């Protein structure tokens, strides 16, 4: 084992936070220093040259002190027996740099602890603060890291002696293996294997448990029901399917695949042809697929990987739909118990304790969103939608006083994608078809996830909780998706016959499902499975839940094509078996010469005993709201701090929202980028205005008073959130229903039945809306011992509805931004509660630790439909200036958020809403506030009346310029406050979370910036005409120069980059680094090179540095790049990851010696912003005629801060006039202040060019916003092309 020092690992503020935590724990630690240390497992000793190469490869990040400070060593590494995602990616880079004798690289974190001697107990306490026990181990000596590379002989299969010991043997195995088998399932297995005349193996039992777990089989949703002694006519699933039977319109696939599919639009899908690799538009149907999953149990145990693999698993579901599909846009949501932010505890928050083995709600919301965002970011899918609810309270329920909340959290992951018409249905698996595992190797992780997630938290053994934690590698999943993309792009020649993702239960669930769904059996070889841990037993190899894997059936004649695609994308795969005629599973193990699995498929997936739920209805009545202690002014401040209401910027700016170039509506609204969007919208392609929209609805606390009302409200809220997009008819909307319940808890089962019936049998059929997809999680309860007391925390019945729809014109989407620049205006409330104004289970009751009695509900189904149809007319006719639905916090919050987005005031009169101001302002009945022009008010009110809404419409008042927020009732002042004050209250929860998680100085700067009342918002100043197409004369000559659109594994922004160059008149050619390294392509034939954005190698050795070193350490490829850069007629552009990569190639680029490096953002966080930049005077040929222009641009990076050697280096860079772009604030001043400057770069620098101007590198993404519709905000006068299109046309002009 070789040991090499790495870079300093923690920023100063992270060290300060660690020291603070030590102080809180009464540990006398005076200082902490941390640096990375690398361990290399080698097959043979490295030569001096190889060692020097490895050392250079592992030099990234800040420079090291010559010697680490003195102190006691605590070394934190991945848990022995596991392989970290960092290791997988770093080892790949080493191999691509010619270091083939490196078997594996791994990285640890070496802490040097200074201070008085601590006793052994205190050291253990300190070690616990420094590592995640679920994923990491602590050593006190560097040599102990040898354990990371320990190799074991394979363990043999075990047999369970039922023939000798009968039922007791199965019962013991059930406990030992954590199978979570029910008693009737044990009987079933005993009968089955006795009938086969043999003892089952442990792997067969484990496989059965996973395949038949509640998580995988959804037994409760398929159960028979008796309620209050009455047999119910339908299962839960049949009631959901009733929506499809009633309204099958536009649904192409439901209930039978990894995601549902509905009709989309005929558009030009942009991708490279297989023959020449040239990008072009392909006119075809882009149907819409939709899926929403939950990943609750893993997120409770270890939030980052739990949320990351939750998003990753859902993305795989989309990609594995039909015969292969394309994930496009994602969503993430969380329900947790109260945060109790240190120093910011709220009056409604009480600490009820928790089990040791799960983390706190604060930990979940600190780490979980980062994990979900990181996976989406690195994969290259924009996360555009979400929700965040907290609930934890002592409630007087139908069971008396009990604790209700989300100690077991909800972690929601979902999204939409596109699929070709001819790939919607899976193909036929022919006998002899090759059975393939695509993706990473098996590792001993995630064992038992299906069974573990089916238990209430606290029931399973702690070791099984450790075993069920998973690890994420989104860059690997991206490679696999690139393979799937190449396959579906082949159309009728697609080599994929059948595909499923590998999720819960690993291959033990995926492979039987694949062959069974294809009407076949399978014969497999265990030792052909890619395996990074050869010491695993057959059970561990077959059943582990290593992520980023798919199982496929491929025709033998197409294996050569499939192999070629995988090799180019560097996506590992293994052929592990063949499809058989007989529906039988046979798993051979050539190492031991036996068959760990030899069983008929119908034993595994046959008719296991059907569940019967015999339950009783119980529903709390609640208590009338006690108003004596409620002051309206105090209520407003409390509600503005409640996470469900409060600003969620800390959850949004960590997620890339612009990748693909097809995002037309993200969360951030208007020139002031306020996170209040009602829904997410994407364009269907890069050449059309058709699109897709998705929205969320959930009102879980209402279930504590009325199960069915809570479910109806979730559907209603999803509809009111999506209503301001141009959809057309209501039946175009399709829903995903995700049900979370504590099955078995008194009253909850019958409540679940009533809620499903309310939606599936009544509301959705009445609205003609289909629920073609969904998921359930039936173990939403946590048990633990608190002192001598047994405690339980039970979640409310929680239905999360996601609405999906095809959009006619993405430009018609209306946002909550109030307008004061359109003349006199009117604000109208459309109250679908029809004056009921119920306050039960609202934000108001929650912040006063009450529940209330009567909740909101869908009062009139016809009016809800009429409301949607009326909004569609108003949207199509462009009569709406602004729109925002009423939800958590009620009307007051709706108006406030609209005012925040418009940076303006409102004056309203609520007299028409009744005499109860509290109820009028804080009820959460369905509805919306719309802003219209004053002269159109009468017409709008008539249209609403024509749709049956006459009794729901109330004129409130108007939006006004300034900082007022005034609510009156007649002549009485009900509430008056500055809008800017409300804005800061609303922001405080996000600010406090950001301070805890990120650099607190940056968080403070952002909060301070929100107090600038003179902030003009994003604005534009152009020194050229963006409508002028300066490339048109050259395009007319029909000469299309070739641009090499260069990507490395993990790059994800190449398609939109190619589209921008294509529009400017280039032939954009797809060039993978593997093409250059293999000599299939060379740069000699290109005049232009663009290195694209993303996460090459997952950024593990510094952003873009691994990519650069794979060029620098390969002599032939290095010479090729150097020759290209030295040719006097070439152009080169590097964007984001490509910028970082090219900055590390500066020794090859003439005139680039002053270029900086790009390092970790000052905030120490990934930053996704829509930032204002100014084009500086520079030689850049890409920026010609743009100098002095100021305009917003997409920013998405974690390492974008300019790093120079010293002040002299910075001065030389400036004096050379090589700075091409700078961040400016909304006042147009160059800035280093966060977040206007999102990475902290000196002098606002964010793009530099070479002396000749032929090579330019920039961190922002012009290719994602070259279309006007792809800008989060833009001036209304812009046409199809945004001003950023000029960059690409400048390039075309330069080539003549």
UniProtKB/Swiss-Prot annotation:
Binding residue positions for ATP: 306-317, 677, 887
Family designation: In the N-terminal section; belongs to the FGAMS family.
Gene Ontology biological process terms in this record: 'de novo' IMP biosynthetic process; purine nucleotide biosynthetic process
Pathway the protein contributes to: Purine metabolism; IMP biosynthesis via de novo pathway; 5-amino-1-(5-phospho-D-ribosyl)imidazole from N(2)-formyl-N(1)-(5-phospho-D-ribosyl)glycinamide: step 1/2
Location relative to the cell: Cytoplasm
GO cellular-component term (any): cytoplasm
Catalytic activity: N(2)-formyl-N(1)-(5-phospho-beta-D-ribosyl)glycinamide + L-glutamine + ATP + H2O = 2-formamido-N(1)-(5-O-phospho-beta-D-ribosyl)acetamidine + L-glutamate + ADP + phosphate + H(+)
Subunit architecture: Monomer.
Gene3D superfamilies: 3.40.50.880, Phosphoribosylformylglycinamidine synthase, linker domain, PurM-like C-terminal domain, PurM-like, N-terminal domain
Biased composition (Basic and acidic residues): 1000-1013
UniProt-annotated catalytic positions: 1136 (nucleophile), 1261, 1263
Listed name of the protein: Phosphoribosylformylglycinamidine synthase
Predominant location category: cytoplasm
Highest taxon of source: Bacteria
